[in-house]
Each structure stands twice: as structure tokens, then as C-alpha cells.
Amino acid sequence: DEVTISDKKNNFETNYLDDVELNAIYSGKKSELILTENRSGTSFNNARQMYNQTTSLNIYQTDDAGLQLNIGGRGLDPRRSSNFNVRQNNYEISADPLGYPETYYSPPFECLESIQLIRGAGSLQYGTQFGGLVNFNIKKPTRNHSLEAVIRNTLGSNNFYSNFTSLSGTLKKFGYYTFFNYKKGDGFRSNSDFKSYNFYSFLNYDLSKKINFSF
């Protein structure tokens, strides 16, 4: 009998987008797919750890809670990701994508299924920001249980406290996913205290194997 033992030093949790996904074509484009399962630094939305396996990104943090995402690529200024087209579930989340494309909101890392990153000329089809595209994909309802609950509490320095609570499940043809995220802290500088409340809800109904309604 032959016995094979294998192991790996680190989990490499960055992949590439498929050539064709749903109604989008990514063939020939510089793309990356960041898998969020079992990533470190998720409780603080720590961008340095979230993107630590993604090359050529310039990242800095202006707060210690991950309230805003500051990433840049190709030598561009990372301030509030103004040179990236930032989306959530393929929808713009910038305040004014054309006139003032700065991102004031970043979804909590615990709720993400994956992060799509497209750079180069291929990203221009999504907007005028030539740094690239960042798309946050929120988790979908779990298919294995009628009710799945996740509760996560985190304490940190500077009186930091974070609570993430999510509910997910599928009942016959009806699926749901919702979460609430609360953060508070004093910050590492004077006059930088904060409170953050995030709520998200997704409902899905399968009309058939190929047709479903969601909102």
C-alpha cells in the first residue's frame, strides 16, 4: 500500500476570477479573488491583513477599527480608496462615483464571502477610477440549515468593542441572510472616538432551479 502525507506551510487564500462568471467576462484581465474564510484580522477589519496576499497595493489606516478602507494601486493615492471603484454586491457604495468618489463605508469582514479585485484597463468598464475595481460579495443564505446564528464579540485597546451578529437559513424555497455590526472605541488619537452601526438584510425566493427573486 502507498501512503501519501501532504501539508502546507501557509494558506494561500487568493485566487483568480473565472474567465466567465454570470454575465461578466474576465478573460484576459488582471483579476484576483480574495477568499475570506479563515482569514486573520477580521474582527478589526484590518486592511493590512485582509489584503496581505494581494500584490502591489498601497494601504494605510487612519483609524483602528477599519471604518474606512484606504487602498491604492499602480502608485495612486490610497486615501479613502478614491482611485478605486468600490462596490458591494456589484452596486456602487461611493457617495458620488463621478464627482467625489471617496468611500466612507467598508462592510465588516465577517459578513464577506469574497472580494473581487480587477486592475488595469479592464476595470474601466465599471467607472472612471483607473486604479481598479473592488467588489465586496456578501454571504448568501446557508442551504444546510433553517437557522444558523453567528455571534462574535471582540475587545481591544483604546476601549474598542465590536459585536457582529448574523442569522442565515433556508426554509423550503425561501432563504435569508441578515447581520448587525456594532463598533465603538476611543481611537488612538484625541477626539477620534467613534460609534458605528451597520445593518444588512438579504431575502431570496427560488421560483425554479434557474429563476429566483431576491432583494
Question: What are these model-predicted stretches?
Answer:
Residues 39, 58-69, 127-130, 192-195:
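Short, glycine-/polar-rich solvent-exposed loops and beta-turns at beta-strand/coil boundaries
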Residues 8, 120, 137, 152-158, ...:
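Outer-membrane beta-barrel pore domains and translocons
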Residues 91-119:
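Short acidic/polar hinge/loop motifs at secondary-structure boundaries
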Residues 157-184, 189-215:
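Transmembrane beta-barrel wall of Gram-negative outer-membrane proteins
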Residues 69, 130-132, 147-149, 161-165, ...:
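Hydrophobic, lipid-facing positions within transmembrane beta-strands of outer-membrane proteins
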Residues 32-33, 43-95:
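Extracytoplasmic beta-strand/coil segments of soluble accessory domains associated
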Residues 51, 114-117, 134-136:
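Non-catalytic regulatory/gating segments with a bias toward low-complexity or hydrophobic composition
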Residues 4-42, 67-70:
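N-terminal periplasmic "start-of-domain" segments of outer-membrane beta-barrel proteins
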